[in-house]
């Protein structure tokens, strides 16, 4: 009986319909379906396999190389004109009709004197804005700075009135290009006002700046009374 079953099973499989094929594995046969578990579609074409679900998002790739440099853009619009520069120093007098320059040579005229209108405090440049004298136009009231127009030896002096009454002190420094060249201090000492004064003689080159900087405390302005003043003039040129 067993022998009959072993012979009948391969014959039944071989006679089944469809394009399926089988393969002998020893004494048994394995049936294979080329269309997968779903079989062919209605028109005989293989049925599509359902897509797999998307996997996890990958890491960000490395940054690519920089592209080529683009061409320069068009020029921008023309900017507004700048402010006019400071006037230059006066030139030496020319020879008059039939005359010559004095034997002593040219004597420059550079001098200024200005007072302080409004009070200041803290750490700032004192802008002496009440200008009385400015021969040569080397002092600028808006910035409080004297700019040397001619190399030579100059004299400067300053007198600053402290606004006290609260037990504090006041320091005022004369600066040349940001470096202290003279200092003065006024202390309260139970008084409402006290003066800090000093003077210097400096050699300056063209473009050097001289100004007074408050280094703590309060300064009385004085409106037009000129309690606090700054002055200077050239002694002789190089």
Curated annotation (Swiss-Prot):
Annotated region Disordered: where? Answer: 36-101
Cite the PROSITE patterns for this sequence: C1Q (PS50871)
Tissue specificity is: Highest expression levels in testis and adipose tissue, lower levels in skeletal muscle and kidney.
GO MF terms here are:
identical protein binding
Asked if the record carries the keyword Transmembrane helix, the reply is no
Domain spans labelled C1q: 105-238
Indicate the principal place this protein occupies in or around the cell: secreted
- GO cellular component term of the entry, any: collagen trimer
Entries under Pfam families matching the protein: C1q
**What PANTHER family would the database entry show?**
CEREBELLIN-RELATED, COMPLEMENT C1Q-LIKE PROTEIN 4
The molecule here is called Complement C1q-like protein 4
Originating organism: Homo sapiens (Human)
Recorded name of the encoding gene: C1QL4
């Amino acid at each position: 009986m067993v022998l009959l079953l072993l012979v009948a099973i391969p014959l039944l499989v071989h006679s089944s319909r469809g394009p399926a094929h089988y393969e002998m594995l020893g004494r048994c046969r394995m049936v294979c379906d080329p269309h997968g578990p779903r079989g062919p579609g209605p028109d005989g074409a293989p049925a599509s396999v359902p897509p797999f679900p998307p996997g996890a998002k990958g890491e960000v790739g490395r940054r690519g190389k920089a592209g080529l440099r683009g061409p320069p853009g068009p020029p921008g619009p023309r900017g507004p004109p700048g402010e006019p520069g400071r006037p230059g120093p006066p030139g030496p007098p020319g020879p008059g009709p039939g005359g010559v320059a004095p034997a002593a040579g040219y004597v420059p005229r550079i001098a200024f004197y200005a007072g302080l209108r409004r009070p200041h405090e803290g750490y700032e440049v004192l802008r002496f804005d009440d200008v009385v004298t400015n021969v040569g136009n080397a002092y600028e009231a808006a910035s409080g700075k004297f700019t040397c127009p001619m190399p030579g030896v100059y004299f400067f002096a300053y007198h600053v009135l402290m606004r006290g009454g609260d037990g504090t002190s006041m320091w005022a420094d004369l600066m040349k290009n940001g470096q202290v060249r003279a200092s003065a201090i006024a202390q309260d000492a139970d008084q409402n006002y006290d003066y800090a004064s000093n003077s210097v003689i400096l050699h300056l080159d063209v473009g050097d700046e001289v100004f007074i900087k408050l280094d703590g405390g309060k300064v009385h302005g004085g409106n037009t009374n000129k309690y606090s003043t700054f002055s200077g003039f050239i002694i002789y040129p190089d």
